[in-house]
Amino acid sequence: MGLFDFLFGKGKGTSSGSPKKGLKRITVAKRFELSGRTGQGSMSKVYRAYDRELGRTVCLKILDKAKTKKFEERFAGLKKPHEGEVCMTLRHDNIVRSFEHGITSDGEPYLVMEWVEGLGLNYLVETRAPQLKGNRINYLGQLCDAVQYMHDNKWLHRDLCPRNVMVDKEGVLKLIDFGLTVPYTPAFCIGGNRTGTSDILAPEIIKRKTTDHRVDLFALGVTAYEVFTGQLPWERSVSSEETFRRRLNQKPRTAKELNPQVGDDLSAVLLRAIEREPGDRFPTATAFKDALGKVEKQDY
């Protein structure tokens, strides 16, 4: 029995994704010296902190217990692992390293991760940072490696977007935030759950169809569009439903239309990555990486 099955079992079950009994319990003020909040998601707060027990600077993520419970109710009857349980199984150079997870004295789930000294990929894209020049294909290749690792180990990230990617000072990319990650099993691929970032949801999710790893590959393609053009393939609308309608019914803008510096070969690769039909996309993240590596111009 593998670690995945040992932790979470197979398929359907009666337990929720809530933290299990017997987890380590801590008092945040005693264990950590907080030096500032670095981010806040819809269900969590993230801090830079000095961990007195580990003797190092770490990233401390504390989840809101009420919001987390409400989110997990969407997976009633399934053995959805808690984010901390997911993170503790992931060991890859391009995935943020997690050291520990448990419960605070206030009853909130927490996660202790490595501190990444760097910038978010979303910031690099939005500011058109010089750091991107000549590194776009390299960064995306690293992201493909992280995604392939997750799929090989039976996980679907389900929220791949520039906001969830960090690039450290050495140019090493780190995939972060596994709050929406689910096991890659039939029970979690049943259509109906449209949880996720609207900009990157694949058509089959929007149509509430059965899904597989190619929902991540679609999101990877949209992320690549943003990296090369600074824009989304489809114009964003103030309404999620209108955004979805455009994605289902309108042709995407080509990367070359959005950025004339993009060559025809790269533009074609990016279009294939976001095909509406899953079978028309690249079959794996590695295949997408290989296609990017074959475009004539590599110094984007």
Predicted regions and their residues:
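AlphaC helix of the eukaryotic protein kinase fold
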Residues: K67-T89
